[in-house]
């Protein structure tokens, strides 16, 4: 079956229409005295096709453990060890409230199967692209798919001194760091499905035998889709990320604060923070999963997405500050970009001039 390459909204709607409700999800770490199901987790409710998880340590993980490596090379291998095919799970839970009469929002849980490609590796710079490839069981247990979705991207740069950070109200600014601040550290820049920026921060890898983890500085980011669809009472998700390798995958942990800005774009004086949230995303290596639809999508559309990244690079090089509107004229930025990439995946030849016009017109609507 030809892969269905769709937008995030269409993907979720398509999957929901054929979904079988999963077994009740666990509240292992939650609010035990809340009555009823007001805190029943929201998010994905589908079941995927049968999967086989890896049980033996990966070659990439073993490569990180090799004796005699320089710190730089061990860092690099740890980043590269995040590539590959995974079952992913996402859990987010408010754990502490700072407002009178605080009521925690519903926890969020979801899942996916995705492949992480090494798009670029020049030594001190590594680019990883996530691509979701999902097979979903319908109510009768029949497997539907594959559904293909370009997901997020992470760029890693060694001793980076030129960052772009979010300051709220759709605004981004250049942040220059000193060589001393960057020494021995890696920046991680995270990008959304349309390659627009999400957050960027410096952090340092630590390696102790079988333990390898990178921890970021506190960084601000726009509200994620899982929040913008249900609330608008705060403006910045401010948090610390930790990426930890495991023998059969990796885990991303987040500790986030939900920050309110005043009309001047400053933290609200009386009550800047609403709540603290913990997040855990687990990436578990898969064995013998068919990611070929994702391979084909990336082979056919990768040149277009390279040009999209180049357009963003031009923005970063030329502007110390810019405003990015995720939605403009009733349309989100990813829509025309996904539509053109879908045409390429369906066999249309890449037309550099046509692609350039799609990119130009899209950026003109969404950047200020």
Labelled PLM ranges:
Residues 1-3:
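Positively charged n-region of N-terminal signal peptides that target proteins for export
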Residues 7-15:
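Bacterial N-terminal signal peptides
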Residues 22-81, 94-99, 104-106, 125-127, ...:
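Amphipathic/hydrophobic helical signal segments and adjacent flexible N-terminal regions
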Residues 80-84, 118-124, 242-250, 285-290:
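A short, structured loop/turn motif at beta-sheet edges
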Residues 104-106, 110-120, 238-245, 270-271, ...:
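Hydrophobic/aromatic beta-strand elements that line small-molecule binding cavities or substrate pockets
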Residues 120-152, 156, 160-165:
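Extended amphipathic alpha-helical segments with heptad-repeat/coiled-coil character used for oligomerization
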Residues 178-238:
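Short helix-loop boundary/capping segments
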Residues 215-263, 273:
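Extended serine/threonine-enriched, polar tracts that run as long, contiguous segments within proteins
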């Amino acid at each position: 079956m030809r892969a269905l390459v769709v937008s995030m909204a269409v993907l979720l709607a398509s999957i929901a229409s054929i979904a079988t409700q999963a077994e009740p999800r666990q509240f292992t770490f939650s609010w035990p005295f809340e009555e009823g199901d007001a805190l029943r987790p929201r998010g994905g409710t589908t079941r995927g096709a049968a999967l086989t998880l890896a049980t033996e340590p990966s070659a990439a993980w073993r490569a990180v453990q090799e004796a005699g490596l320089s710190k730089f090379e061990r860092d690099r291998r740890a980043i590269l060890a995040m590539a590959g095919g995974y079952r992913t799970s996402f859990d987010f839970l408010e754990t502490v409230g700072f407002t009178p009469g605080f009521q925690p929002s519903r926890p969020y849980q979801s899942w996916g199967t995705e492949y992480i490609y090494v798009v670029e590796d020049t030594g001190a710079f590594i680019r990883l692209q996530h691509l979701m490839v999902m097979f979903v069981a319908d109510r009768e247990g029949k497997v539907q798919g594959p559904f293909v979705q370009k997901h997020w991207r992470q760029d890693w740069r060694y001793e980076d001194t030129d960052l772009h950070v979010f300051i709220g109200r759709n605004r981004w600014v250049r942040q220059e760091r000193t060589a001393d601040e960057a020494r021995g550290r890696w920046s991680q820049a995270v990008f959304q499905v349309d390659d627009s920026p999400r957050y960027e921060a410096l952090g340092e890898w630590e390696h102790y035998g079988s333990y390898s983890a990178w921890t970021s500085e506190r960084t601000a980011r726009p509200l994620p889709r899982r929040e913008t669809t249900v609330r608008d009472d705060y403006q910045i998700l401010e948090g610390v990320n930790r990426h930890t390798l495991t023998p059969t995958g990796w885990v991303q942990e987040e500790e986030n604060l939900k920050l309110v800005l005043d009309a001047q774009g400053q933290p609200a004086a009386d009550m800047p923070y609403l709540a603290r949230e913990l997040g855990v995303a687990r990436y578990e290596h898969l064995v013998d999963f068919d990611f070929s639809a994702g391979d084909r999508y990336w082979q056919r559309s990768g040149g277009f997405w390279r040009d999209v990244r180049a357009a963003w690079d031009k923005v970063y090089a030329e502007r110390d500050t810019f405003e990015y509107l995720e939605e403009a004229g009733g349309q989100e930025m990813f829509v025309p970009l996904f539509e053109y990439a879908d045409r390429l995946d369906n066999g249309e030849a890449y037309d550099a001039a046509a692609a350039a016009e799609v990119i130009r017109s899209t950026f003109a609507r969404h950047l200020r």
